[in-house]
Amino acid sequence: MKLVFYGAGNMAHAIFTGIVNSKVIDSNDIYLTNRSNEVALKEYAEKLGVNYSYDDEALLKAADYVFLGTKPYDFESLAERIKPFITDKNKFISIMAGLPISYIREKLEADNPIARIMPNTNAHVGHSVTGISFSSNFGPNSKDEVDELINAFGSAIEVPEDNLHQVTAITGSGPAFLYHVFEQYVTAGTRLGLEKAQVEESIRNLIIGTSKMIERSELSMEQLRKNITSKGGTTQAGLNALSQHDLESVFEDCLRAAVDRSVELSSQDED
């Protein structure tokens, strides 16, 4: 199985680094290419022990899976460049936000299998939750291979393409939403009189420890919360204060706004 990455930006870098580190395939079977920054490309390739090239014909002749990791606005020119060299064995995996499978197929002028994936920045530490949708001609064995690749940098959740908007909101943008919540926690903690550095370090460790509790426990998050909430205690007092601000509606509004924007961006790209 040979992989070609078009684009070596932040997310593509996290993905191919995760795949290399997992050893799910030999690093010599991975090829990188980008639009113009050969210095950065060569540095990535040498550091990871993978190949790099600007020969589109040779790349597509070799590739089983072609990762499309360019900026969405650069894709049309990329498609124009590579479509003469597409072979029957090429299967495409898009990490470009907002571009539907139908649009990608139209620009490539090819009936090859196409998957869209929506990872998040936790791919950098091997813990992305990645939404994935497949075109109807993606075979079961190929799907298994793609799942194996995605598991190299996290976990996969397969959904119909229309539901990628929801996945984008919940898990794609999710790290930023949680970071914002943690920021507010730090700010509130400093207002209680502690040094900011103390609060930041405490909350960082609190987040890590709580994540491990969720990971290692078979209990629901609701039950984990109940287990540490004593009637009439300090935790109950704080939760009572939180409940007065209708957090459920706050988070629902947050996610709906992200979904709506994802739909809007997708519609713009199709025009």
UniProtKB/Swiss-Prot annotation:
Reaction(s) this enzyme catalyzes, per UniProt: L-proline + NADP(+) = (S)-1-pyrroline-5-carboxylate + NADPH + 2 H(+); L-proline + NAD(+) = (S)-1-pyrroline-5-carboxylate + NADH + 2 H(+)
Leader sequence segment: none
Lineage summary: Bacteria, Bacillati, Bacillota, Bacilli, Bacillales
Purpose of the protein: Catalyzes the reduction of 1-pyrroline-5-carboxylate (PCA) to L-proline.
Coiled coil: none
Main location: cytoplasm
Molecular function per GO: pyrroline-5-carboxylate reductase activity
Pfam families (alphabetical): F420_oxidored, P5CR_dimer
Gene encoding the protein: proC
A biological process term (GO) from this entry: L-proline biosynthetic process
Top-level taxonomic group: Bacteria
Family: Belongs to the pyrroline-5-carboxylate reductase family.
Record-linked InterPro entries: 6-PGluconate_DH-like_C_sf, NAD(P)-bd_dom_sf, P5C_Rdtase_cat_N, P5CR_dimer, Pyrroline-COOH_reductase
Protein name, UniProt field: Pyrroline-5-carboxylate reductase
Transmembrane segments: none
Record key words, sorted: Amino-acid biosynthesis, Cytoplasm, NADP, Oxidoreductase, Proline biosynthesis
Gene3D superfamilies the UniProt entry points to: NAD(P)-binding Rossmann-like Domain, ProC C-terminal domain-like
Pathway: Amino-acid biosynthesis; L-proline biosynthesis; L-proline from L-glutamate 5-semialdehyde: step 1/1
Enzyme class: oxidoreductase
Listed EC numbers: 1.5.1.2
Cellular component GO terms held in the UniProt record: cytoplasm
Subcellular location: Cytoplasm
